[in-house]
Each structure stands twice: as structure tokens, then as C-alpha cells.
Amino acid sequence: MIELILSGEGNSDIGEKDIQLQSFIPGPITVLTINILNYFHKFDIKCHFINRMQLKKYPMTLKGKKKREKIKTTGKGHANLAYKLACIARENNYQVAILMRDASKNEFQSIYQEIMGGFETAMYKNGVAAIPVPESEAWLISCLDPNESKSIEGCKTDMKKLLEQKLLKRNQAHNKETWCEIAGKCAIEKVEAPSFNKYRSDLEKVVKYLF
């Protein structure tokens, strides 16, 4: 079994904690991540979650002026969050840490470098940046209609509205349960969205490292 820790933008992408049961309720991007990992290697996966605000409040643990300066100049906050997530993963012996952030097509490379810079500063090898372009709904649309996936990142239509329209045409509910079902059934090998394929490729590298 491998254990992941994930953090994202909001409750509708990575997931949320059930306050009463104190358990993690996976969102569509977590379900999609499990789907991708199992595409490369079948194994049991346990997911842990920390929301954005909790991660922001988590203390920096690097000591020494030079290391603090290195963290500070790595990025616009994304590097700090990636660093903190890596620290949490290491402290709890989680094998993989995944930080998700939406990005425009022009922002993708800089945000990717910031996140990976944070993981590298923490010397954590299995950190992965999940960066849907322009937002997580684009990946779900790509799973729903793989033929549209190659051009989805250049589409100027609101992704949330587009996903809702596509689900209405299929007489499917526009809710988290449906999104998770789409993610779980996604034909990983058919999706051509560049940001999706980068995520898939990075997860494949992690699988090869672990096994």
C-alpha cells in the first residue's frame, strides 16, 4: 500500500474532510489521481488531505538564514506550500505528496516550477504538481469527451458551465458524485490535454521510483 497526501484549491477538486466521521471524502481530482496510478501499477492506495488554509498555517521547519531565504525566493507562495506539504509527508511517512493549483495556459510553466522548486528544497523526491489548465473541470471534460481534450486548454468558454452543459445533454446530475464517477472511469490513455499528460507522466515517474 502507498499513502498520498493531497492539497488543492477547494472542496470540489481534491475533496474534503467529513467532520463527524473525521474521514476524507475524495473529490474528482483525487479519484482521477488514483485512476492514473492504478493505470501504471495496481496497488492499494490510502489518501490523506490537508486543506489550503491549514497548509498555509503549517509552520516552516527549515532552520538557518540561507535556507529561509531560499524558500522565500522560490516562488509566490506555491513553493512554500509545496515545501510544507513535503514536510508533512516526510513526518508521516507518506510516499507521495500532491499539490494542485489551477493555472492559465501562460501561467502553467511558472507555477509548475514554483511547486516543484518547493518540493526540491524540501529534498522530497515524490512531490507532484497537479496543474489543470485552465481549471480542474477541463480535465473532467477531457475524460468525458477525449476528442475535445487536445484543444480544451485553448477554449475560452467557462469550464464550469461547459461541464454542466455536457452533463445536462447526457441527463447526468451536475454534482460531485457525477464528477467522481467521470474521473474514476476516465480512459487515461485517450486524454490529450497537455497539462493532464504532464500530470500523468509525473505520476508515472513516481510509480517507477516506488516500484
Show the residue positions of the predicted features.
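Activity-critical C-terminal alpha-helical subdomain
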Residues: 100-174, 178
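Generic beta-sheet signal
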Residues: 2-4, 70, 95-99, 127
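Acidic carboxylate-rich catalytic motifs and surrounding loops in phosphoryl-/glycosyl-chemistry enzymes
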Residues: 44-57, 131-134, 177-189
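Structural alpha-beta junctions
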Residues: 31-46, 92, 117-131
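Charged phosphate-binding loop/patch that engages nucleotide di/tri-phosphates or the phosphate backbone
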Residues: 174-211
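Domain-level signal for Mg2+-assisted phosphodiester chemistry and nucleotide/NA-binding surfaces
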Residues: 1-77
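Well-ordered, non-membrane alpha-helical segments in soluble/globular domains
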Residues: 24-32, 74-86, 107-118
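Acidic beta-strand-to-loop metal/phosphate-binding motif
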Residues: 6-8, 93-106
